[in-house]
Amino acid sequence: AAQADVTSMIRTNCIVKEDDMSSINKNKYLSLTEKSFYKKLGKVTKIVGLTIESVGPDAKLNDLCRIYSADNSQELYAEVVGFNDSNVLLMPYDVVDGIGPGSVVENMERPLSVKVGDGILGHTLDGLGNPTDGSELEYTDEYPVEAAPPDPMDREIISKVLPLGVKAVDGLLTVGKGQRIGIFAGSGVGKSTLLGMFARNTKADINVIALIGERGREVREFVERDLGPEGMARSVLVVATSDKPALIRNKAAKTATAIAEYFRDQGKDVLLMMDSLTRFSMAQREIGLASGEPPVTRGYPPSVYSEMPKLLERAGMSDKGSITGLYTVLVDGDDFNEPITDTARSILDGHIVLSRKLGQKNHYPAIDVLQSISRCMSQIVDKKHKQMAGRMKNVMATYNEAEDLINIGAYKSGSNRNIDYAIYKIDAVNKFLMQQTDEKFDFEDEVTQLSDIFADYEAFENGSLQLKK
């Protein structure tokens, strides 16, 4: 009688016809429907490109669904990404294999979540938060991958320095706990190496690192060469390589953010590093176009420009802890005004620009200090530190303006005291800005080195300093 009622319910709701029952495992199908006689299942009707279209089930945007292959040998998880009239548009988390018209779709009636806890430290996870080595990890809670940012009025004001152990950043572009900084650079200028230095040298309690759309060979290189055992011990790595489906690459960024949110809620100071925000946006472009969104600027659909602030605003201060966000942005063709770069720069609390020209001079890290800014620095450092940083930037700007004249021998020493002082100090400035990847400095030592360079500045101002010819 129960089986007859279920079959009647299925036929009445036009989900799976009685004569289609031979194409699936009836026992499996009945076990799904016995949970609730009124739960509608869906049926796949079309697969085009990245999307699967189905009639039913009842679902909401971002709901997690499970799709069963026709012979019931495989299960595929997918997410609701849109609707076509009354039909449901799904995007799979894995390669579509064995799924075809008539495959059953079950709504899990919950969004994607990630398991969290201290047991995930030191491990590498995939885009959905599963350990890549198949090991069983100890979890204490689950956090939703999609979450709202903290209420603006609940955020603590950024007031404390987060030392990152890189002199050029700590000295001239000081980052505060809860700040969000973009690292803007073209390809091959040293973004990943700089992230590795931050991860090893930072004073943050926890590192959460997301590698989005990276080459497969670079993942192990980053773990063993850039991060090292010291950095990995207090880190969680979330990896979605370039061959993964767009939805996985998109979710990996949000999974890493959810993990960082968990540790922030435990009162920790978290450093969230994402490489790269550009590839997250590219994944969202694939999802948006596959869902039928129109392309606008440079082929990016509107959802790209709405998803980016949703992701970035989740970082920052809360009333419990902090997430300091470092997001690399791959600058297309070294054009710093292209849409993704421009949008990210407008949302973030500052940016660090890496210069290909400096890299070609073997000046690493290749940070162009004069093109970079930390919008929170003036609020978190003392007056003397701010003054010394300003003097160094002034020396660099003065030297850059006169560099061509100096190089061709057209500048006559003594004709401009500011240029003379810049020439006198430029070697010390460059030495301060350059740093080996295995070098580590305390914040107090960095500030002391910065002050020592300009210990004679007052003598220069009053004219008593004798500059070397």
Task: Indicate residue ranges for each PLM-predicted region.
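Active-site phosphate-binding and catalytic loops of NTP-dependent enzymes
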Residues: 32, 74-77, 112-116, 131-137, ...
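Short, glycine/charged-enriched hinge/interface segments at domain edges or termini
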Residues: 96-194, 199
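Low-acidity, Ser/Thr- and Arg-rich intrinsically disordered low-complexity segments
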Residues: 8-11
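Flexible glycine-/small-residue-rich
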Residues: 46-48, 56, 69, 82, ...
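P-loop NTPase catalytic core
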Residues: 171-172, 178-469
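N-terminal accessory targeting/assembly segments
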Residues: 18-123, 127-132
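Phosphate-interacting basic helix/loop segments used at nucleotide- and nucleic-acid interfaces
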Residues: 24-29, 108, 164-169, 256, ...
